[in-house]
C-alpha cells in the first residue's frame, strides 16, 4: 500500500511494476519448504549462481518450515563449487536489535556471511555496510 503523499515510494513502486511487466517472474503456488527442498535438489548448470532470496517472509513461517528451508539451503551449500555457487540473501527484521531491516548474504562454497545493510522497511533510508565493513 502506498499513501498518496509518499511520492518517492510511489516512484519506486511504479519502477518495480515496470520491471515486473518487462520481465514477468515465474510464480509457483505451494508450500515454501517443499518448493525450496525441490528446487535446491535439482541439478545446477555449471557457470550459474543459485540465489535463495526472501524479503519480510521468514517471520510468517512456522518454525518447522524455517528449519526445513534452512536445512535445504545448508545442504545445497555443501555441494556448491566456485563454478556453481549458492547465495542466501535475506531482507528481514532482526529481533535482537532495534534496527529496522537487515540485508544479509551468505555465500557458498566459502560459507561467508555478510551483513550488507540496515534499512528502512520501505527503502526510505539505507545504511550500507558492504563486504568490507560487514558486521
Predicted regions located by residue number:
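Class I S-adenosyl-L-methionine-dependent methyltransferase module
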Residues: 1-29, 41-46, 133-135
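Residue-level recognition of the N-termini of beta-strands and the immediately preceding loop/turn
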Residues: 25, 48-50, 83-87
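Generic beta-strand/beta-sheet core signal
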Residues: 30, 54-55, 89-91
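A short, acidic, amphipathic alpha-helical segment used as a generic capping/interface helix at domain edges
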Residues: 30-44, 72-77
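Non-transmembrane, aqueous-exposed alpha-helical and coiled segments at domain scale
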Residues: 41, 48-49, 67, 96
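A short SAM/SAH-binding and catalytic strip from SAM-dependent methyltransferases
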Residues: 50-63
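C-terminal substrate-binding/active-site "lid" region of AdoMet-derived donor-dependent transferases
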Residues: 61-112
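A cross-taxonomic marker for long C-terminal extensions/tails that follow the last structured domain
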Residues: 97-135
